[in-house]
Amino acid sequence: MLLALKITPQRSTQYAQLTASLAAPELLASPLHTMIHEVQPITLAGQSYLLATVDDTCLSDAMTVKILYRLGAISEVYEYFEQIGDVLGPLLRPVEPQFTSFVPLEMAEVRRYKGKTNEIFTRVLLNVALFAGNYANSSTQRIRILDPLAGGGTMLFAALASGYDAFGIELERQDVETTAVFVRQYLEGEHIHFREVDERARKAGRRYQFEVGSKGDTRHLVLVHGDCSAANLHMREVAGGPRVHAIVGDLPYGIQHFGEISDLLSRSLPIWEQMLLPGGTIALAWNATRIKRTEMMEVIQKGTQLQVRNDPPYTQFEHAVDRVIKKRDIIVAVKDI
C-alpha cells in the first residue's frame, strides 16, 4: 500500500524547508516504523508530500491512523494510486482522521512573542519524546508532560491539544504572568470550560493551575515561576505530584558556549531523571551551531543513567532554523523500565 502524507504547509519558505526536513524522521520514529518499507519525498500539484510504502494492513487499525494525524510535520493523509481502472493517476483518496485535539491546535499558533519556537517543530519534539519511550501508544494513562524551560508556553499548549496534562516551569516571572493571562483569554474566547485552582499560590505569583475541559473529561495546565533545576520541588504541590512521562524542552538559543549549557544541565538532569516514570524520556532541542551532539551526549551520560538514543532516526533531526541558528538538533534519552 502507498500513502501520500502531506507535509504541513508553512507561511514562509524558511519554515517549509524546516518542516520538510523533520517529516521523515518524525514518521520513522513513530510506532508505525515497523509497518513502513520505504519513504521518499515527492511533489504533487506543487505541494510537498512523503510517499510511504507500508503494510497493506496499515489503515485497518484506528490507532495507526490516529498516530498519523498526531504527527506535527504531516497535515493530511491519503491513499495513493498510480491508476484506478482505466484512469491514470496519481490519484489520492483521503483517509478519515481519527484524532481530535483536546483544545484547538491553534492555541499553540496564535500567540506571538519574542523567542517563540515554531509550533510545528514543538509538536515534532513532543511526539519524538513520547515515541522514544514506553508511552507512545498509551490509552490507559493520563500522559503528563513537563517543560522545565516553558517560556511563553508553546510546548504546554501543544501538549494540552494532544490531550496530555501539561506542566511548565519558567524563571522569568513576567513570562509566567503574561502566559497565564493569555490562557484565560484564549479559553474564554473559545468558550472552553476551565477553572483555576490553588488561589493562594496564584496570588503570590508563584503558580497558576488551570483545570481545562468539561466535568469528567479535564486536563491540567500548570504554570510555575521558578528554576528548572528545582523542578521536583515546584511540582510537589501540583495535581498528581512530581512524576511525569516526558520532560521536553527547548534550551535557550542565546547561549553560545557549551559551559553555560553544561552547567544548566549538570544541575538539572539528576533532578529531572528522578521525576521520570520508568520508560519515560527527556527530549531537548538546542542550538547545534557551536555545541556538538557528542558534547550533549557526554553531559547526559555523565549526570544520569539515562540511555541516549543515538541511532536513526533520532540522529536525523538536525536542521537549519535561520541565518543565526544554522543548525538545531534534538537529543532524546530514555529511563529504563
Predicted region positions:
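Class I S-adenosyl-L-methionine-dependent methyltransferase catalytic core
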Residues: L2-E26, I67-A73, I84-L146, A150-I337
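N-terminal accessory interaction module
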Residues: S21-P94
